[in-house]
Amino acid sequence: MTLEQKVGQLFFLAFRQDTDGTPLWTYNNATDQVLRGVQPGGVCLFSENVHTVNQLRTFVQKIQGACSTPPFIGIDQEGGSVQRIRRTDAIPATNVPAMWQVGQTGDLTLAEQIGGVLGSELTVFGVNLDFAPVCDVFSNPKNTVIGHRAFSSDPQQVARFSTAVSAGIRKAGVIPVCKHFPGHGDTTGDTHVDYASVNKSLDELRQTELVPFRAQIQAGAEMVMVAHISLPQVNGDDTPASMSHRIVTGLLRQEMGFDGVIITDALDMGAVSAHYSAGEAAVRAIQAGVDMLLMPADPRAAYDAVLAAVRSGEIPEAQLNASVARILALKQKYGILSGKSLGDLSLLGSSAHQKVVNRVD
């Protein structure tokens, strides 16, 4: 791989709007130019990309065709309020209940089956990565961002149920992503808008927020998403966790022993974009120790900044190589590099899947 191609692997891009501002259902020249220019390691789909079954399958195939190294195709398919692919007249998908309801069942076998429903239906569209499950502990009733996206307010319950859902997603051949490290469950602010902080010490985090992530790592988690939350008692300032070397490298990589792929939360969110340029945010996150950059506000500017930082030595090339090795190893593990075919259409909204979700009260 050339240096330019290696840097491209660090990027996870999204294309939500057409040039006229309407939802992007049809692959267009603007998307093609960015994909061929950056050669990203992944592309994230949104509801704006979802119209019909055949439309979405074609859209994904065209994305794959523009990337010389097969990309991760990701989506937020958590269940409940966050499902980018929902049942419509044109898409007979299975609507999955909120994870809070799944946690309330107390049934870990059912939770794993729910993960299987989520993962297997994504394969129909060529999606190989699910930004789920939420591993946050819902410990602050004023937290409107997480709410019933979480499994429970009990850290051990979140640990058990999130690892079960991850296992189901994984068995379907899809990569689960544990989010939002080091825990977004005790915030009142919304990082989509601006800074949101968790005012806890590292010891307090270890007792609550980190419990599910520790369990996920022990169970073989391959990818972790780092949030943009601020941890003033840990960092001493408002630095987002996604740009904190102490959090990403010191805590997640070294103390907790995670050796998989670390990805940021979306870099176009207000907690980042209101305070950093796209290039600065990208470089700072890589310097903190992340492997992949999700949705920078300006993909080309972020790519150019990271490439320049590697060339200048501001980002060591050895670090770049280590990140690319992790990314490619994960793609290899899931058969992505050999080019996977689309999953069987019969999986979508199957009676077996409906029976599973019907068991969640």
Residue ranges and their predicted role:
Residues 65-70, 169-173, 254-259, 313-316:
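Short helix-capping segments at alpha-helix termini
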Residues 22-27, 203-217, 241-248, 252, ...:
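A general structural motif
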Residues 161-162, 166-178, 182, 191, ...:
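Phosphate/pyrophosphate-binding betaalpha-module
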